Amino acid sequence: MDLAKTNVGCSDLKFCLARESFASAVSWVAKYLPTRPTVPVLSGVLLTGSDSGLTISGFDYEVSAEVQVAAEIASSGSVLVSGRLLSDITRALPNKPVHFYVDGNRVALTCGSARFSLPTMAVEDYPTLPTLPDETGTLPSDVFAEAIGQVAIAAGRDYTLPMLTGIRIEISGDTVVLAATDRFRLAVRELKWSVLSSDFEASVLVPAKTLVEVAKAGTDGSGVCLSLGAGVGVGKDGLFGISGGGKRSTTRLLDAEFPKFRQLLPAEHTAVATIDVAELTEAIKLVALVADRGAQVRMEFGDGILRLSAGADDVGRAEEDLAVAFTGEPLTIAFNPNYLTDGLASVHSERVSFGFTTPSKPALLRPTSNDDVHPTHDGPFPALPTDYVYLLMPVRLPG
């Protein structure tokens, strides 16, 4: 075997760093590695040591991830090793310094009394990571993570319909609107941010799965930067970039038409209800135990009472009554219990307000604010301003 050839792309990289920071960085990059890579090198993570520290990166032509870690670099260079294997190893190591160095066509890793020898892959076969587009604006990472989580719950998981697997991001100056739908529910969140150009306008569709992973990585309240380009370069590269906290990632934009969602949001309601989120959630989970595969939970709204029911004679029935503030004509409507509890978990408030039109049309859920006053007059009731809505299609009632 030609050892010179098997060692192509490796270098005398040698470094030492804390186990915890190494494991965290490798695990974050490894999350984005493909399960079934089209070529073997795409299953690897690239480790590059320089005067500025250690950089760990991964790329599968769709998503790139790169993180910088503080490390003592004894010798600069780059090496490519299996990402998931390295992630498994670093997470299992004792909490002691990790020593890592290239040894011929392998790498040696030691931590305490544990020693590993891992094969390397050819660095020169690894694709070059894309350049982050120009910065567009920033916002706190915890705000970004919360907003993404609130809308991603409604994103589709059928990848034959790519327009439903993304999160629509609309930017107009200092306002960002996020939206996602799987045809059965729609979630929309509006938030403010610091934009570099006050007249910036853009609309893109970003894979929801990637956004969720990226958002979860930074929830400490530090700033996160969103990059779409600037001026005539907005979206030109077909990339969406996110950076912050020493981490940066890019993902290719989805080339698909997102549904025109605003026309789906009702401007007024014929009936409205306000109820405690925790009580309603627990009651839904309880009565849904007799629902056939989560088929439906029925909600009967009347004067001060909400009756939840589920099931049928052949599988069993369940009912529970809850106190509710309700105004409008008595209403019976049914929902998929899983979709309903998803919405309740996403409003992020102690109480939730429902807006109804008819039992066959979508209901609107929104967080109840401290300033809300439940109406006592006859409808119709105008939809109130809110920074979050969850629109849910009902299930057809039997008969």
Swiss-Prot record:
Key words, A-Z: Cytoplasm, DNA replication, DNA-binding, DNA-directed DNA polymerase, Nucleotidyltransferase, Transferase
GO molecular function ontology, one term from the record: 3'-5' exonuclease activity
Highest taxon above the source species: Bacteria
Subcellular localization: Cytoplasm
One Gene Ontology CC term in the entry: DNA polymerase III complex
Keyword Transferase in annotation: yes
TM regions (residue ranges): none
GO biological process terms held by the UniProt record: DNA strand elongation involved in DNA replication
Oxidoreductase recorded as keyword: no
Disulfide pairings: none
Pfam family, one: DNA_pol3_beta_3
PANTHER family per the UniProt record, alphabetical: BETA SLIDING CLAMP (PTHR30478:SF0), DNA POLYMERASE III SUBUNIT BETA (PTHR30478)
Family stated for the protein in its record: Belongs to the beta sliding clamp family.
Task of the protein: Confers DNA tethering and processivity to DNA polymerases and other proteins. Acts as a clamp, forming a ring around DNA (a reaction catalyzed by the clamp-loading complex) which diffuses in an ATP-independent manner freely and bidirectionally along dsDNA. Initially characterized for its ability to contact the catalytic subunit of DNA polymerase III (Pol III), a complex, multichain enzyme responsible for most of the replicative synthesis in bacteria; Pol III exhibits 3'-5' exonuclease proofreading activity.
Assembly information from the UniProt record: Forms a ring-shaped head-to-tail homodimer around DNA which binds and tethers DNA polymerases and other proteins to the DNA. The DNA replisome complex has a single clamp-loading complex (3 tau and 1 each of delta, delta', psi and chi subunits) which binds 3 Pol III cores (1 core on the leading strand and 2 on the lagging strand) each with a beta sliding clamp dimer. Additional proteins in the replisome are other copies of gamma, psi and chi, Ssb, DNA helicase and RNA primase.
Protein name as annotated: Beta sliding clamp
Taxonomy of the source species: Bacteria, Bacillati, Actinomycetota, Actinomycetes, Mycobacteriales
